[in-house]
Amino acid sequence: MLCTAGDGVCVILRLPRPKLHDRGGSVNTQYERYSFRSYPRDELMPLESAYRYGLDQYGTENWPDTVNYLEISLRLYRLLRDSEAFCNLNCSTVQMADVGLEGNVGGIKDGSHQARSLSEFAELRVFGDVLKRTQCLKRCKQGLPAFRKSQPSREVVEEFQRREPYKFLQYAYFKTNNLPKAIAAAHTFLLLHPDDEMMKRNMAYYKSIPESEVHIKDLETKTYETLFIRAVRAYNGENWRTSISDMEMALPDFFKTFEECIAACEGSREIKEFKDFYPNIADHYVEVLKCKLKCESNLTPIIGGFVVEKFVATMYHYLQFAYYKLNDVKNAAPCAASYLLFDHDDQVMKQNMVYYQYHKDKWELSDEHFKPRPEAVLFYNITTMQKELFDFAMQHLVDDDEGVVVEYLDELLEGNAF
């Protein structure tokens, strides 16, 4: 019995036991025609148009075109996110000082008692950097194909974030007798929707097919996930060097993916109401923060149906023990300190640190060896500050009670703030 997306109808299929022949190539080739820098011209179209057309074809049971356009829309979505991340990352450090306005503003000359550099005008400096960064982004986007077509609505983007296209793709694959991809698409959707009854029933049907397990793959898997799984398997087999090698590659790849994720959050925004200047800026930034705060959880692997809790900390946990087993305490101690950044109450890791410190002379450890690794500190600081800013906004920037505002203004007036 297989269920269809959209109406939730389950159809009893009286078919001979299907064979697992992949008519559309390996399930690993979901993005085989995808290239960020040289996207195929014949596929370049508005993301929303491709997606809506694919859904229309699904409604008319035109399964080949459903598959074609939904796959294209997935590649277009990846292109858009990669393009947003590319431009925002490359323009993230641009400042107004780069165009020579640092030392001479408004005709006031250096050396006079009135001389001021741009850095002394806090607001002008901030918005000068904003203008320069905007110029950089404009130039960058003009050269990328993803921005040459109309941009998708927020609702469509959110559907892709929820992996909704795979709900329709899995049935279209099934109807085109591409069971390997149908199984992979169903699994890909279920990873984010483990309680979806319709897809759970479909997956149960697929699993009843002999040799189906080999096709249970996440079509949106990231490189660091594969490296992490390999590292854990090596760890469980006590292959410490292999585990360390793969885990040390997984860490920077995760941080790179995380950086790209938060950069991609800085895309376009739909303005729904007009506000004063600063409240409008704050609203936009809070929306961006909300997106960025989802990156860590969205990038956390789901293995065997279970989320890897405290993923970054977990990688350092594996590393510190593997290094210790190789008697490489100079690398084990910083990993232990890095783990404690994210879980400072972990008693086992605290005991490990006490043990390392007690034997520091034996292993020739300095104070530097008991500090977290720089990339761990950077990730911790970014995620912590993002959460603090968002919490502040939720606490103080929601619609105020009129009486509270009056009391606050009274305090300002009493303090001669105006």
Label each residue range with its predicted role.
Residues E43, L47-A50, Y166-F168, Y173, ...:
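TPR repeat positional signature
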Residues Y51, Y58-G59, Y77, Y173-F174, ...:
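Hydrophobic/aromatic side-chain positions at a characteristic register within alpha-helices
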Residues R33-E48, P152-E164, S212-E225, I302-V312:
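TPR-adjacent "capping" and linker segments in tetratricopeptide-repeat scaffold/adaptor proteins
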Residues L20-Q30, S92-Q151, Y171-F174, Y206-N236, ...:
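Alpha-helical linker/edge segments of TPR/alpha-solenoid repeat scaffolds
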Residues G24-G25, S35, W63-G103, L190-S208, ...:
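Short, charge-rich amphipathic alpha-helical segments embedded
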Residues G54, Q170-A172, N177, H187, ...:
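Conserved small-residue packing positions in alpha-helical repeats and bundles
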Residues P46, L80, R162, L179, ...:
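Residue-level recognition of tetratricopeptide repeat
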